[in-house]
C-alpha cells in the first residue's frame, strides 16, 4: 500500500508552538538560568517533521508508521539522547501495534540464544552483559541500550540479533566477498548492488580516513580496488542485517523495529535498499535530529520523519578515554578492524590490519584486555602500544586528550 504523504502542522499550531517556546524561554530566564545563544533549529525540540523539515502531526504519523512491516530507528551509537528517543518511540509504536519485534545491530546472530533467555526473564542485567561479552562485542555503554532491552522483556517482545561477526566484514574489506568460502559467510546471501548515491557516500567516507581500511592492509592495491572492497563489505553488512529483519518479519508476522546506526538506514540506502531487494519495499525510516545539525541534510530523502532534539545536557561524569577503533578477535590475538577518522588511534598511526600485542606493558590477547587498559588511562596521558605490521613489530604512542578538549 503506498505511503500516505505526511500532513503538515497547521499555521495555528505553529503559532501555538512559537508562543509556548517563548513562554518556556521566559520562565528559564526568570528562574535565573543562563541565557542560551540564539539558535534556529531546523526541527524544533519535541517536534516531528518530514524529510524536508516540514512539521507533521505526531499521532497520525505514528499510526501510519506502526503498521509498516519494518520500522528503522537510526542512532549515533554514543549519544544517550538518541537512545532515549528510540525507547520513547518504541513505546509509542507498541501502544499502537503490540505485535512488534525488536532487531538490534549491536549483537551478532550467534548470541540469539542469550537474547531469548533475556526476554524470557532468565537472566539479570549483569548476567546478560557477561554472556554477551558486551564490552568486547559492541563496546558502547550498555546503559544506553538496557532500557530498550528491559522494555522488550517487560512486554515479551522478541529481540533479534541482526549482526554478523565483525571479522566477516573485515575479511570482506581486505579480500573481497568472492574470497570468502560459502561455509564461512554465516548464511549471508549476495547483496544487491548499491545505489550510485550510496556508493559515492561510502567512497567519500573512505577517502576521509587518513589511512583507509583496505589500502592499509593491501598497500599494492589501487585506490579503486580498495574502495570497491570497502563498498562491498558495507553491502554485505547491510545485507546481513536486512536478511535477518526480513526473516523475522516472515516467520513471526510482526512489525520489526530495527535499532541501527544512522549510516545503515539514511536516505533509504544500506539496509532499506537491501530490504527492498528482499521484497520489503515499504519500510519506514525515523531519525533523531540534533539541534546543531546542518539543515541542508533535510533533503527529502534523509528519512520518512525526524524528531527534533534539544541541545544535549548530560550529567557531568568522567569522560572515558576512547581509542577510536573496532577490534577483530582471532586465534593469534586482536587485529584492528576500522580506525575512526580523527581519533586517538588515527593520530597515533594505527591502521586497519595492525595486530596489537602489548598496551602499557600488558600483553593483549583479547579485545577485553585492551579495553581494560584503556579504561585505566587518565585524560592527558600517553599509552604506549606494541603492534605487528607487515611481519615486523613497531612501537606507537596513543595520546589521549586532556579532559574537556
Give residue ranges: language-model regions.
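Zymogen propeptides
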Residues: 53-54, 58-94
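Bacterial N-terminal signal peptides that target proteins for export
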Residues: 4-20
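PDZ-domain C-terminal substructure recognizer with occasional recognition of PDZ-binding tails
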Residues: 152, 351, 357, 372-405
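Conserved PDZ fold ligand-binding element
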Residues: 345-367
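PDZ/PDZ-like peptide-tail recognition elements
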Residues: 298-341, 346, 376, 395-405
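Bacterial N-terminal signal peptides
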Residues: 16-30
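A substrate-binding/cap region within the structured catalytic cores of diverse enzymes
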Residues: 113-246
Amino acid at each position: 500500500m503506498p505511503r500516505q504523504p505526511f500532513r503538515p502542522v497547521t499555521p495555528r499550531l505553529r503559532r501555538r508552538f512559537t508562543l509556548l517556546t517563548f513562554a518556556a524561554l521566559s520562565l528559564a530566564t526568570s528562574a535565573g538560568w543562563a541565557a542560551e545563544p540564539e539558535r534556529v533549529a531546523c526541527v524544533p525540540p519535541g517536534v516531528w517533521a518530514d524529510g524536508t523539515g516540514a512539521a507533521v502531526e505526531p499521532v497520525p504519523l505514528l499510526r501510519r508508521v506502526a503498521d509498516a512491516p519494518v520500522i528503522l530507528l537510526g542512532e549515533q551509537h554514543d549519544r544517550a539522547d538518541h537512545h532515549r528517543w528510540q525507547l520513547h518511540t518504541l513505546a509509542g509504536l507498541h501502544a499502537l501495534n503490540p505485535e512488534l519485534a525488536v532487531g538490534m545491530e549491536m549483537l551478532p546472530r550467534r548470541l540469539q540464544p542469550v537474547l531469548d533467555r533475556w526476554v524470557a526473564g532468565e537472566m539479570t542485567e549483569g548476567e546478560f552483559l557477561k554472556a554477551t561479552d558486551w564490552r568486547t562485542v559492541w563496546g558502547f555503554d550498555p546503559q544506553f541500550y538496557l532500557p530498550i532491552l528491559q522494555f522488550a522483556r517487560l512486554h515479551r517482545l522478541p529481540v533479534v540479533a541482526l549482526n554478523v561477526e565483525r571479522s566477516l566484514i573485515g575479511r570482506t574489506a581486505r579480500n573481497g566477498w568472492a574470497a570468502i568460502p560459502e561455509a564461512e559467510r554465516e548464511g549471508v546471501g549476495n547483496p544487491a548492488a548499491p545505489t550510485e548515491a550510496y556508493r559515492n557516500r561510502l567512497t567519500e567516507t573512505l577517502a576521509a580516513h587518513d589511512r583507509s581500511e583496505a589500502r592499509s592492509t593491501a598497500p599494492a592495491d589501487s585506490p579503486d580496488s580498495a574502495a570497491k572492497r570497502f563498498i562491498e563489505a558495507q553491502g554485505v553488512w547491510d545485507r546481513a542485517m536486512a536478511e535477518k529483519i526480513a526473516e523475522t518479519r516472515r516467520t513471526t508476522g510482526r512489525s520489526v523495529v530495527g535499532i541501527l546506526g544512522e549510516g545503515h538506514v539514511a536516505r533509504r540506502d544500506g539496509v532499506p535498499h537491501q530490504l527492498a531487494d528482499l521484497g520489503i519495499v515499504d519500510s519506514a525510516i525515523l531519525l533523531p535530529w540534533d539541534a546543531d545539525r546542518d539543515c541542508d541534510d533535510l533533503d527529502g530523502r534523509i528519512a520518512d520523519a525526524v524528531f527534533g532534539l534539544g541541545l544535549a545536557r548530560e550529567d557531568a561524569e568522567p569522560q572515558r578515554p576512547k581509542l577510536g577503533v573496532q577490534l577483530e578477535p582471532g586465534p593469534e590475538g586482536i587485529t584492528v578492524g576500522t580506525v575512526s577518522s580523527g581519533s586517538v588511534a588515527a593520530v597515533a598511526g594505527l591502521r586497519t590490519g595492525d595486530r596489537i600485542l602489548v598496551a602499557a606493558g600488558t600483553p593483549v590477547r583479547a579485545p577485553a584486555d585492551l579495553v581494560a587498559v584503556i579504561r585505566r588511562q587518565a585524560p592527558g596521558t600517553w599509552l604506549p602500544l606494541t603492534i605487528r605490521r607487515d611481519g615486523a613489530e613497531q612501537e606507537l604512542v596513543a595520546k589521549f586528550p586532556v579532559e574537556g578538549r
